Amino acid sequence: IQDSDIVLLAVPTIAVEDTAKKVFEIVKNSIYVINVAKGFHPVTHDRLSVVIEKVADKEKCKGIISLIGPSHAEEVILRKLTCINAVSENEEAAKVIQHLFSNDYFRVYTNTDVIGAEIGVAIKNVMAIASGILEGSGQGDNARAALMTRGLAEMSRYGVSYGGKFETYLGLDGVGDLIVTCTSLHSRNFMAGFEIGKTQDVATFMKNNTKTVEGILACKVIHDEAQKRNISMPITDQVYAVLYEGKSPNQAISDLMKRDLKAEN
């Protein structure tokens, strides 16, 4: 990649920092860095564009762009119609990537709300685990619809508190990505939740899982940060209790349904 003008990072969240650092040590040219991982730094809790920015050689970085939106690679490779966002604070950089990737079956929009988009794409993975747990536990469409709707409320509440824009969560980076990740068998997060809900045995799943399930780490980061900021995240809290505190999935579902009654908004 030493002579590249554009470098795409397609690695797990925990590898983004080291990979980006090595990229800037190798490349000769000033480059656009594209990131497709979703989540937060496991220690600092930084968003991934911030992680990349901290290790970037400023003289070699033209822009950091995240590709975010409802997109499963299994469908893109088959040229199924897909729409996503090129997300960057540098709108011109986002437009470069927009035009590079757009074609007859893959349409790219731009979005400069990096905070909102990066937070949304991490939280939707947590909601996908929750959606899978519901499905694995034998719940139906009604429950999943409620989960996605209330999950969107958590997503926007958390993101706006950090400076994200509410309208971002009504677009591809919010409700769009939430729908596809919470309903698709292609989603590793959904399938992880499904297995946990079906077996009611999170310990065995965690021991045997060999796939990258970004929502597991994201859940811990979001839960911890929400606690510090006193942000109400009831679904996230229950997913955290299942993943990290040994709570049974069925008990978590029951506790959500037994919360104090209130107006929706």
Regions found by a protein language model. Give the residues of each.
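Glycine-rich beta-alpha junction loops
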Residues: 38-40, 68-72, 88-90, 112-117, ...
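Structural signal for hydrophobic packing residues in well-ordered secondary-structure cores
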Residues: 5-8, 27, 44, 56, ...
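Rossmann-like NAD(P)(H) cofactor-binding subdomain of soluble oxidoreductases
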Residues: 2-79, 97
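NAD(P)-dependent Rossmann-like dehydrogenase/reductase catalytic/cofactor-binding core
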Residues: 124, 131-135, 160-170, 174-265
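Generic structural signal for well-ordered, non-membrane alpha-helical segments
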Residues: 16, 41, 45, 49, ...
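Internal alpha-helical scaffold of NAD(P)-dependent oxidoreductase catalytic cores
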Residues: 15, 26, 51-63, 81-168
